[in-house]
Amino acid sequence: XXLVGXQASD
């Protein structure tokens, strides 16, 4: 559910 850097995780 969150976007970190350029990676979508959960």
Swiss-Prot record:
Protein name as catalogued: Unknown protein from 2D-PAGE from elementary body
Origin species: Chlamydia trachomatis serovar L2 (strain ATCC VR-902B / DSM 19102 / 434/Bu)
Misc remark: On the 2D-gel the determined pI of this unknown protein is: 4.65, its MW is: 26.5 kDa.
